[in-house]
Amino acid sequence: MKIFREVFELGNKEIILETGGMARQADGSVTVSCGNNVVLVTTVVKKSVADGTDFFPLSVHYLEKTYAAGKIPGGFLRREGRPSEEQILISRLIDRSIRPSFPDGFFNEIQIVATVLSYDGAFSPDILALIGASASLAISGAPYDDVVAGVRVGYTNGKYILNPNKQDLRDSDLDLVVSGTYDAILMVESEANSLPESVMLGGILYAHKHLKTIINSINRLAKVASKPRIEYSIYQINKFLKSQIKSQFFGEIKNTYTIASKQERNLKLNAIRKNVLEYIFSSDVDGNEYTEKEILEAFHDIEKDLVRSNILEGKPRIDGRCTETIRPINVKIGVLPGVHGSALFTRGETQALVVTTLGSDRDAQLVESLDGIEKCRYMLHYNFPPYSVGECGMVGMAPKRREIGHANLAKRATQAVFPNEEAYPYVVRVVSEILESNGSSSMATVCGSSLSMMDAGVPIAEPVAGIAMGLIKDGAKYAVLSDILGDEDHLGDMDFKVAGTRYGVTALQMDIKIKGISREILEQALEQARVGRLHILGIMNEVIKEHKEAVSDVAPQIHVMNINPAKIKDVVGRGGATVKGIVEKTGAQIDTSDSGEVKVFAKDKKSMDMAVAMIEEIVAEVEEGQVYKGKIVKLLDSGVFVNLLGSQDGYLPFSEIEQAGMKTNSLVEGQGLEVLVQNIDRGGRVKLSLVAR
């Protein structure tokens, strides 16, 4: 067993790449270690293309084992189940980073599995998994020539932090992950606290500078440990077939791509495709027999060339816009009468109905991870039904990876403006229903979420808007597109989503299909996105620019009380009897804390006011000189104890009773008396006198 190792430093932390010791039957197997974190990443490459495959079947699976953190899983089976949303997001991050580095037309299946074997809690293992995925690919024999690496960058007190730990990130205004090759940037994912575009760009370039150390180490490992390159073929469009289709149908295709309506355009294109198939099948084009798949791929290539060349030549885009124009926007709030907050955001042929629901602490999501169980007060869910693109499909299933990814992006975009628990005690769930989609539904979700929360009275710090930028690049010539359509995303080279407030960026997500982009393109895309974002915010602000002061009449009420911690036991009562009585009488939810915090959550104001009044009565402090209506709770030889407030009793001597003209032998437990608090001694003992009738 021969083991190869590479060691390098990243942000003053030593990282070790090792191969040859584990999972040796995989085509590529690398363990990545940093401190007590260990991630095993394997790559398996199929040596042939499966019949009928017309895409690159790359799959990435990031898995966390609870034993890595010295824990036993919960649940009846006591074993790991389906991956969590966080694990799915990390799988997507790795996939998006490495996918652009494979040659076009490579259709061999590749499966990458990253398994967290040991975890120390200080650093997230996601970057180690990304580095390991690249290293295992580099030694697997796959056609992976442009080695990729990734790093995380933070930003605190005006300085960038390389490879920040979890504590660093808590204090950071930026959580940025960048991956790329030695020469270019491939993927960006970030969450930020309304930072200027210049800071975001600086962070991306800072990250890229430090990628080179990792890439050099991976290359050194591959030089000594790589398997021979597999034999593979590249699928290519038949040029003669393409020319034949173009000669007969190009005029029709060109005219069709001037139709702004997506549905009308697709109907016309489908008709042309049908005619193309009939033409090729009925004529002896060059003595060859072509499959329907080959014909349609050649047709698609003509579409791609046409759309791209039009844009690069400065001609109008598919829907007639120039590169910087935003589609028409329509904004409505309060569109659903029975919900707590709602908004309908429409941009061109993309429409999101976003609904906000307010809840109590008990509605918070409990998220289990290697770090333990975390309470999530802000949830954002994204649904993409098939009718949104005019198709039939499965409905009501578990969310797909794409839906999870889009929800996470929208949440990251709005997280920076979401109020903390002290300022806003509600738990909030936002749901985005995509009703129509023709590009950038995730950014419509960002805009709709901001509007919907403001409609619900959630005190977000600033409205947030998002925009998707695209890129068409051919050699040195390129065009950056604002607010891309679905076809421009599909046929273009970049999908760059930028969200933020009027002050700066709150989230970035960039994916590209080419071998990387330059600083110049990034700079232009960020500036163009800033202008577009401010335009969108301006339209949103015409409808609502700050949160409503009051929640909806149908929304639940919440009230937070801070009482003397010693009084919590009085509110709860023996065995919880007191608090249960309040709940049964008012219908409110009551949560208490040893710190003295009491949260009252009720379905309406009447219920809440009643519960608050009952609690205030229990915790009220007896004051000297005040008159109270109490009840006798105990008879003694020399006097009686009278309950005044809650569990507070006072002593009333018989002498005081007789002085007021009342006979002591007529007193019984439960009898009401009006008494005056004469004094309260240092021990808290209360002396009473009877108020004369």
Curated annotation (Swiss-Prot):
Keyword list, A-Z: Cytoplasm, Magnesium, Metal-binding, Nucleotidyltransferase, RNA-binding, Transferase
S1 motif domain boundaries: 625-693
InterPro entries per UniProt: ExoRNase_PH_dom1, ExoRNase_PH_dom2, ExoRNase_PH_dom2_sf, KH_dom, KH_dom_type_1, KH_dom_type_1_sf, NA-bd_OB-fold, PNPase
Catalysed reactions, semicolon-separated: RNA(n+1) + phosphate = RNA(n) + a ribonucleoside 5'-diphosphate
Enzyme Commission number, as recorded: 2.7.7.8
Function comment: Involved in mRNA degradation. Catalyzes the phosphorolysis of single-stranded polyribonucleotides processively in the 3'- to 5'-direction.
Alphabetized NCBIfam families for the sequence: polynuc_phos, PRK11824.1
Name of the protein in question: Polyribonucleotide nucleotidyltransferase
Organism, as annotated: Francisella tularensis subsp. holarctica (strain LVS)
